[in-house]
Amino acid sequence: MNVVVLGELCEDILMHNPNSVEVFEQKIWAKDVTVTAGGSAVYVSQALSRMGVDVRLCAVVGDDESGKRMLRDLQAFPVDCSMVRMLPNSDTTRSIVICDGPEKDFKGCSPMLPLYIPDIEDLGGAELLYVAGYVLYPELWTAEARDLLKKAKERGITVALDVQMFPVEGIDQLEFSHLEGVLPYVDIFFAARKEMLGLLKTEDPAGCMKLLQEMGFRGTAVFKQGGKGCVVATGGELVRRPGCTVEAYDTVGSGDIFGASYCYGAMSGWDSRRCADYAAVFTALSIGEYHDVKNYPAKEAVEAVLSTID
């Protein structure tokens, strides 16, 4: 399986379990602070790589030490970074998040670098093009990006798109992102509950699917519901699957990991129920305690849990 992942690459600064370590019988320190390669496209790429997929990451970093270090770490994972551009005289985007069990508190992000849109020939050999964080990048709202997805679909490349949300309130993100222009070329569409509400003004999966179809969408929509699982909509059929109960340490990137593992199943020819169950288990096993890099599970560990699910 060969995949190109297009989207966000940043340096994540993650504080885990604040005020959990005691000093003089008072809980003062955080358990740890982790600095790691992050961003939607990175979590998707790492998860797919751990599943044995050949992954090419298409993203942008600055030419600072953070950017260089992240590329070294990703290449060692391994993730193919030959499509990552390093912008001269630029600082790599950094994001700060506080993680307290299943809760995550996004504190801020430095300016995002402009994303470049690859040429269709750059996708040579790809079976899947995964767009990670569509609404986050104005470059993805352009005719150039729309044409890339159109050409990819014409060449038989499966197109997956995780919509996400721009961190700005009071604007119509559906309108300014021109989502309706790309939906006809998308095979697998992902949205979390806040994105369903923010973009489509409803959390009802059937209602969301109806609106997507009115905009030309003809694929499979996966509505992510966190620990509660997901709802998969294909045509007029809805499949509801539960999540997995685990003790979460860090849920940053969990939606991206879910999308990656769902696509792994879809590209393997599985039905929507098995795809959803595999994604739920793989994600649950990825959000436990770790050091430096998430503990993405081996496929054998996922299959062992899947064998217990009805």
Tell where the protein language model's regions lie, with residue ranges.
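Glycine-rich phosphate/adenosyl-contacting loop at the front of the ribokinase-like
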Residues: M1-V60, E65-R72, A76, Y249
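Structural motif
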Residues: N2, E127-L128, I188, T220
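Conserved phosphate-binding/catalytic region of the ribokinase-like
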Residues: V3, K150-E154, K201, P205-D310
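Hydrophobic beta-strand scaffold residues
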Residues: V55, C81, V159-A160
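A glycine-rich helix N-cap at a beta->alpha junction
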Residues: D73-S90
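Conserved phosphate-binding/catalytic loop of the ribokinase/pfkB sugar-kinase fold
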Residues: M86, V97-E139
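Conserved beta-alpha-beta core of the PfkB/ribokinase-like small-molecule kinase fold
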Residues: L128, G133-K210, K228-G229
